[in-house]
Each structure stands twice: as C-alpha cells, then as structure tokens.
C-alpha cells in the first residue's frame, strides 16, 4: 500500500511521518515537490516543517509547485490526503478546504502538548475514533490560528468540515484550551467529500506510547485501511 510522503525544501517531519505510516501498515515513499504524477499512490501525507522558510506566508510557495497538481487530482479522485501543520498550511493555500491559517494570537512560536476533540469521525483518518473523543497530540507552529469569515464558517459547519477542536483534558472546548486563538477552537478541517483532512497538531508525534501518547496512530491506520478499499 504505497503512500506518498511529500518533500518540499524545508520539510522536516517527513521521516517521522514515514515511521508512523509504517507502524500503521503502509509503505511510505518520499516524493519530491517536482513530481507531478502521483497516480501510483493510494494516498498522500503532506508533512510539517518550514517549507521555503515560510516566506511570503506559510505554505504559499509550496502550494505553487508541480506536485500540487497531483495532490489535487488525488483529492478529486477520493484518495485520502492528510496535511499536517505546514502540510495543512499548504493544503489550505492550494484550496483543498476552506479558511486560512495565520499568525498565532500571541505572535509567538508555540510548541507543547494539547488536547483536541473529534468533531467528525466520518473521514478516513477519524473513522476509528468516537465523535467527542479527546486526543492528546502535540503542536509546534507560529502560524496555526485558523480563521474563516462567518459565511465560510457557516458553510463548513453545514457540510461537516470541522474535524477537530482544541479542548481541555475533559473534552470541554474553552478559551483557555485554545493555544493560538483559532476561531471556534478549530484545530483541523476537511473538504466537502471528507477525504482530505488538514490539521495543525502532529499525529505522527503521538504514534507510540514512548512518545507520551499514541492517540495519533489511528489516523494513519484509518488512512491505510480506507486506501485498501478504494
């Protein structure tokens, strides 16, 4: 089960993602941003990092490289595509979902463990979680604050495009549990067809208990199992 793991200039979480994909039973393969054709892959993960130094804004340059055409085709064909941190920024810049990611409210880089609540368990990546389940996953970003205008946000709620929200350990969505000022505590979103998920927390860094949590591993297992069925 070949899964493309994208590699841009400045990507630094690719090997961690490859490890998580292997743990989930997949066969990860690093694919550079110059490659446009991804037809031989059953899914893709866009890992985190600081592609192109986050110049202009995070993900803006990467979203204009050749591989985006192949990723868009994957999304349109219903293949599972996961964007993590910088990968989520790239995915939103490329138009894979609605909304945008901008500077954290405190204007600082934030690196810590957080809790997120599953709002939508109908995606390939969340199929093995219960709706309302609380996951312990770390974040590491400076431009992770999700924003969408009222009209866009209403559209996203109506189409079940909100996948994760920041919460406390008990699952309560509070202002104190929001690390970056994201509107409605939103930590992850998806497209209308539910096969592309973009989130700021790093599930690959929570894929083994020795890391402090293995709550993120089910995202990769869900992806692999979904890819086997399509």
Swiss-Prot record:
GO terms for cellular component: cytoplasm. It holds the Pfam family GATase_5. GO terms for biological process: 'de novo' IMP biosynthetic process. It catalyses: N(2)-formyl-N(1)-(5-phospho-beta-D-ribosyl)glycinamide + L-glutamine + ATP + H2O = 2-formamido-N(1)-(5-O-phospho-beta-D-ribosyl)acetamidine + L-glutamate + ADP + phosphate + H(+); L-glutamine + H2O = L-glutamate + NH4(+). It is found in: Cytoplasm. The active site is at residues 85, 202, 204. Keywords: ATP-binding, Cytoplasm, Glutamine amidotransferase, Hydrolase, Ligase, Nucleotide-binding, Purine biosynthesis. It comes from the Archaea. Gene3D superfamilies: 3.40.50.880. One of its GO terms (molecular function) is glutaminase activity. CDD domains: GATase1_FGAR_AT. Residues 2-230 form the Glutamine amidotransferase type-1 domain. Its main location: cytoplasm. The keyword Cytoplasm applies. InterPro entries: Class_I_gatase-like (IPR029062), PRibForGlyAmidine_synth_PurQ (IPR010075). Pathway: Purine metabolism; IMP biosynthesis via de novo pathway; 5-amino-1-(5-phospho-D-ribosyl)imidazole from N(2)-formyl-N(1)-(5-phospho-D-ribosyl)glycinamide: step 1/2. Its EC number is 6.3.5.3, 3.5.1.2. HAMAP family: PurQ. Part of the phosphoribosylformylglycinamidine synthase complex involved in the purines biosynthetic pathway. Catalyzes the ATP-dependent conversion of formylglycinamide ribonucleotide (FGAR) and glutamine to yield formylglycinamidine ribonucleotide (FGAM) and glutamate. The FGAM synthase complex is composed of three subunits. PurQ produces an ammonia molecule by converting glutamine to glutamate. PurL transfers the ammonia molecule to FGAR to form FGAM in an ATP-dependent manner. Part of the FGAM synthase complex composed of 1 PurL, 1 PurQ and 2 PurS subunits. This is Phosphoribosylformylglycinamidine synthase subunit PurQ. The gene is purQ.
